[in-house]
From Swiss-Prot:
Catalyzes the reversible transfer of the terminal phosphate group between ATP and AMP. Plays an important role in cellular energy homeostasis and in adenine nucleotide metabolism. Residues 30-59 are annotated as: NMP. Pathway: Purine metabolism; AMP biosynthesis via salvage pathway; AMP from ADP: step 1/1. This is Adenylate kinase.
Length: 181
């Protein structure tokens, strides 16, 4: 099964991705993990990403997409994968479609975790991370609304909307049930 996870920061994508990965026996591919792995291994893509990050800039789509492409070519992703953090923009979604088309593949579903902004703020503040203050969180939500939310329309027809305001177990169960239909 080939899946993409969408949802605002704090929706629980990382938590749900791990549970889904285990339940479906497919790798959880997170762009954050890809960046860290490529940087720690000193790959060419990792060096490029590090330069942008050191300068406080966003890593360009091309670098991120190339990391994702390389990861999707690994053996454990042959029977499916769960993408978390990519695509984040329409441009990245187009690139992902091209990557899959080259292999005669397509996404099975796009899971969209829906959660209110107030719940997101509450969750993220309770995590106690240094960079999680209300102003920063609301800025991240604004970026999500502008950049990533348009993907919901892009993937219309493949979207599975999941209410992400319950318990971890309930959300996981709802996701697996939606995928079974």
């Amino acid at each position: 099964m080939r899946l993409v996870l969408l949802g605002p920061p704090g929706a629980g994508k990382g938590t749900q991705a791990q549970l889904l990965s285990d339940a479906l026996n497919i790798p959880h591919i997170s762009t954050g993990d890809l960046f860290r792995a490529n940087i720690s291994q000193g790959t060419e893509l990792g060096k490029q990403a590090q330069e942008y990050m050191d300068a406080g800039k966003l890593v360009p789509t091309e670098v991120t997409a190339n990391m994702v492409r390389a990861r999707l070519e690994e053996a454990d992703a042959a029977n499916g994968f769960l993408l978390d953090g990519f695509p984040r923009t329409i441009e990245q979604a187009d690139l992902l479609e091209e990557m899959l088309k080259e292999k005669d593949l397509k996404l099975d579903a796009v899971i969209n975790y829906q959660v209110s902004e107030d719940v997101v703020v509450e969750r993220m503040l309770s995590r106690g991370r240094n960079d999680d203050n209300e102003s920063t969180i609301r800025t991240r939500l604004q970026v999500y609304r502008e950049e990533t939310a348009p993907l919901i329309d892009y993937y219309q027809g493949r979207i599975l909307n999941i209410d992400a305001e319950g318990s971890v177990e309930d959300i996981s169960e709802a996701t697996l049930c939606a995928l079974d239909k």
